[in-house]
Amino acid sequence: MKTLSEIKEILRKHKKILKEKYKVKSIAIFGSYAREEQKETSDIDILIDYYEPISLLKLIELENYLSDLLGIKVDLITKNSIHNPYVKKSIEEDLIYI
């Protein structure tokens, strides 16, 4: 099981690729990994914002890329997809930007 520090380092090293290939403007970790309460079975929750909208297929490709890169299942959401104010507040409380 990777630590939060290891995950942050991997994501930092790949920021350029994420920006160029997937148009990622910002990337942040939230949820159990951000709170350092993860278990062996935990996935990693990642929030992205992008420079220009990407297609659903590209979003799925990015989620798979990140899962392979980190060796952990990634649950990826976009900043613009959070419409419920309570969910948004809960996510914002955990966010760790890379």
From Swiss-Prot:
Enzyme class: transferase
Gene Ontology terms, MF aspect: ATP binding; metal ion binding; nucleotidyltransferase activity
Superkingdom of this protein's organism: Archaea
UniProt entry tagged with the keyword Transferase: yes
Signal peptide as annotated in the record: none
Cystine connections: none
SUPFAM superfamilies: Nucleotidyltransferase
Details of cofactor binding: Binds 2 Mg(2+) ions.
Reaction(s) catalysed by this chain's protein: L-tyrosyl-[protein] + ATP = O-(5'-adenylyl)-L-tyrosyl-[protein] + diphosphate; O-(5'-adenylyl)-L-tyrosyl-[protein] + ATP = O-[5'-(adenylyl-(5'->3')-adenylyl)]-L-tyrosyl-[protein] + diphosphate
Cofactor names: Mg(2+)
Binding positions for Mg(2+) 1 per the UniProt entry: D43, D45, D75
Residue ranges of the motif GSX(10)DXD motif: 31-45
Record-listed E.C. numbers: 2.7.7.108
Positions bound to Mg(2+) 2: D43, D45
Known partners and oligomeric status: Probably forms a complex with cognate toxin MJ1216.
Job description of the protein: Probable antitoxin component of a putative type VII toxin-antitoxin (TA) system. Neutralizes cognate toxic MJ1216 by di-AMPylation.
Record family assignment: Belongs to the MntA antitoxin family.
Descriptive protein name: Putative protein adenylyltransferase MJ1217
